[in-house]
């Protein structure tokens, strides 16, 4: 005679994708409730800024979150204007008579070619204050040009002041700090990887995670959320995107043997705080309208294996809870967003 558990498992195997997704969401919600997570504090509602990529609007957005700048002084929205010189007399002087300032030390030397040389740093190095110099050879191989472009786009950030491989807040970076790109968040040492969602190792645990995109059966309550691990994808990618491993379908079980999954599992054991940033691609009302935002420190309350949405393959799951006394999380004005899309 078939047991009730067997009938239940059989019915789950016959679920459609959407039914399985809703079932997984229900289980995630039940698990968060079982951890005793209370109701979140009242959230701050923010309208969608029109353009956050300018320095002035970025300051206004950050000041909306924390009230004042990190230095405690109110910042002026208008940029400081430099005094302009009267150029009327300069027009009377012929251009040939105007000489540019020239270094005595460089005088007589060959003019440097800055297009051949680029100072970069590796986001995963143990010594964040030591830059590595990448020299682009004039006799580079055909396949190296794409790598050079990728390095310029993702790693020419300057030298970090702080080490991202530390637990807790980064000095000088307050909760609510906003960046236009993940590269800027990496430069500030809040979340070092510019692509990967988990930063850490199996021995110490995770230092930070990024919520951006995510899995469709994860839930985000702001003060708590579930997070799905990485791995299990076909390394060849898809037919349309053969090198895009992020969009490749899952073809095998995830495992805690994966170093990044093991890092979050270790964090559940040590209960060391994990920095969390949310990105605009996250399907959540707690996601920023654009860019990426630092939402403070969370504790990994639980790590477990669960059935995913692809052919019953298993995934690594984690439950996060936000630490107290970090202020309310901002919340998107969904009505305002809908009006803009109309």
Curated annotation (Swiss-Prot):
Q: Which UniProt keywords apply?
A: Nucleus
Q: Where is this region: Disordered?
A: 41-149, 236-257
* A GO cellular component entry from the record: nucleus
Compositional bias (Polar residues) at which positions? 42-59, 115-141, 238-257
| Chain ranges of the YDG domain | 168-322
UniProt-listed GO biological process terms: negative regulation of gene expression via chromosomal CpG island methylation; protein ubiquitination
Q: Which residues form a coiled coil?
A: none
Amino-acid positions noted as binding DNA in the UniProt annotation, renumbered to this chain: 218
* InterPro entries listed in its UniProt record: PUA-like_sf, SRA-YDG_sf, SRA_YDG, UHRF1/2-like
- The highest taxon in the source lineage is Eukaryota
Give the UniProt subcellular location, in the record's own words: Nucleus
What does this protein do, in the record's words?
A: Involved in the maintenance of DNA methylation. Binds hemimethylated DNA.
List, alphabetically, the Pfam families matched. Answer: SAD_SRA (PF02182)
**Disrupted-gene phenotype:** Mildly decreases methylation of the fifth carbon of cytosine (5mC) in DNA; simultaneous disruption of CLR4 exacerbates the effect.
Question: What protein am I looking at?
Answer: UHRF1-like protein
Q: Which GO terms describe its molecular function?
A: hemi-methylated DNA-binding; ubiquitin protein ligase activity
Q: Where is the composition biased (Basic and acidic residues)?
A: 74-90
Taxonomic lineage? Eukaryota, Fungi, Dikarya, Basidiomycota, Agaricomycotina
